[in-house]
């Protein structure tokens, strides 16, 4: 019976570590993406140039603000959903 108890405790500890690690990794990834968004001003300027638009600073800043607003709305919606 003692061996069975040890095996059960090891399995429970592994499952708890897996679940905990998943949540910690998810939070760290969300924080990283919030601090370092994949699309920055330089990327937006480059995309506008490739589409044939002249990337004025006002247009670039408008797109950046829209993206930030959408990210905040999506984050708020996700928190509300929980």
From Swiss-Prot:
Record has Transmembrane helix as a keyword: yes
Lipid bilayer topology: Single-pass membrane protein
Cellular compartments per GO CC: plasma membrane
Keywords: Membrane, Transmembrane, Transmembrane helix
Pfam families: UPF0154
Subcellular location: Membrane
TM ranges: 4-24
Family: Belongs to the UPF0154 family.
Protein name: UPF0154 protein SMU_1719c
Organism: Streptococcus mutans serotype c (strain ATCC 700610 / UA159)
